[in-house]
Amino acid sequence: MRLLAQHSAGFDPGEPWLEGDVSTRRDSHLFTQMVARRTSPHTGREHSFYRLQGPDWVNVIAFTKELELLVVEQYRHGINEATLEIPGGCCDPGETPLDSAKRELVEESGFATDTWISLGSCTPNPATQTNRAHTFLALECEAKAGLCLDAA
């Protein structure tokens, strides 16, 4: 396999844009919408760019000792239906991604483990969001507690 990178119009896409004023447009429970004025290093023109600042989140791919994959069914208001998904959620302030993953696994499934492997992180929507998604593999999970879902 070979990586083929294409640059638009001969410009260096890694060349930083000069950032001007940044202001908050709207602050909500989960995200803060920001607008940043930036100047193109190629044309010198100024543009507005919108971004959502929010907490990092975690995804947990969890298996029991019997190699059963743990999934949770949750109602999701964004799509107005129930989904079947792996445990996960937002990192709380001051919490490491691993601590968030451990907490979310117990909260959403009642299972816990001491065997954790980080599978890395990514920027799930770098065009408009500033946060990262961290994915963990949890092995040999055992039932430890009842569900402790976030209050809603």
State each model region's role.
Residues 1-34:
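N-terminal presequences and immediately downstream first alpha-helices
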Residues 34-42, 125-145:
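Active-site-adjacent beta-strand/loop module that shapes the phosphate/pyrophosphate-binding cleft
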Residues 2-6, 15, 52-55, 59-103, ...:
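Conserved Nudix-box catalytic region and its N-terminal flanking loop in Nudix hydrolases
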Residues 22-24, 120-125:
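Short, solvent-exposed loop/turn elements at beta->coil junctions and helix N-caps
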Residues 112-119:
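A short coil-to-beta-strand element that immediately follows conserved catalytic motifs
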Residues 61, 110, 125-128:
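Short, conserved, surface-exposed binding loops centered on an aromatic residue
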Residues 21-59, 65:
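Acidic, metal-coordinating catalytic segment for phosphate/diphosphate chemistry
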Residues 68-69, 116, 133-135:
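Conserved active-site beta-strand-loop modules that form the wall/rim of enzyme catalytic pockets
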